[in-house]
Design a protein with these regions (language model features):
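Zinc-dependent metalloendopeptidases
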Residues: 1-126
Length: 126
């Protein structure tokens, strides 16, 4: 039952993405090894408890390994998931990574240089 509740939460967020973003469709496959997005709920990783591979990087992961981990998503309660909840945001965040989106501060075209900001702040304080 816990696993099914988790799956329903993820499916709810996937449905929201499909409704809001033209051209995006998540397809369920019959065999786990055929899936590009493979979600675990307890996979230890240096990335932390909740993480996802970004974009096509998932295609380079062994087919028996997860490409996303959602340890923070519980399945103890039934009744789905509410938009705006912490779990909803967490699932959305990781699914968007799966679709190829990076954090804004990691984008190569960002309008600022993080190392320069640190240097300027340090120089200014002196």
């Amino acid at each position: 039952m816990i696993q099914r509740n988790r799956e329903l939460k993820i499916q709810t967020v996937m449905n929201h993405i499909e409704e809001q973003v033209p051209g995006i469709k998540f397809l369920q496959v019959l065999k786990d090894n055929d899936a590009v997005i493979r979600i675990a709920f307890n996979h230890e990783h240096p990335y932390g408890k909740t993480w996802s591979r970004v974009g096509r990087e998932a295609e380079r992961v062994n087919s028996n390994e997860p490409t996303m981990n959602l340890s923070d998503i519980t399945g103890h309660e039934s009744g789905g998931i509410q938009e705006g909840s912490k779990e909803y945001g967490c699932i959305m965040h990781e699914l968007l990574h799966t679709l190829g989106m990076h954090h804004e501060h990691q984008h190569p075209d960002r309008p600022f240089d993080i190392s320069a900001i640190g240097t300027c702040a340090f120089d200014f304080i002196l």
